[in-house]
């Protein structure tokens, strides 16, 4: 990939700042997962949710998450597949792995709205992550009378 001189200067400066930092706080949102290939519309949606697209006439995963399904079975059919591909499949591009390589030997902490588990899959320490919106891989009862969560992979 070829970059402009100005872009190269900025990335070199950023790399230098990271190398010389005592600590790093990373703030990340949906754009990072999108850059890693976790898109919620287009070809990825069509390949994984074509049956829902035809039956319910929505055209992206986000809309499907708010669709008023007639039955709990339809709701969970959608959400179980959604969680499978957005939590348990690896992202197509190594964006998170590359970010981890930049900070792995640093005192880092991550604050993220991403619920797709990509940080942990790339090697980030769970104790250094704060998921403000949770994790697709964990369930909690609908009347949270305790703080226990349940792994949903199986």
Per-region residue spans from a language model:
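Conserved catalytic core of sirtuin-type NAD+-dependent deacylases
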Residues: 1-154
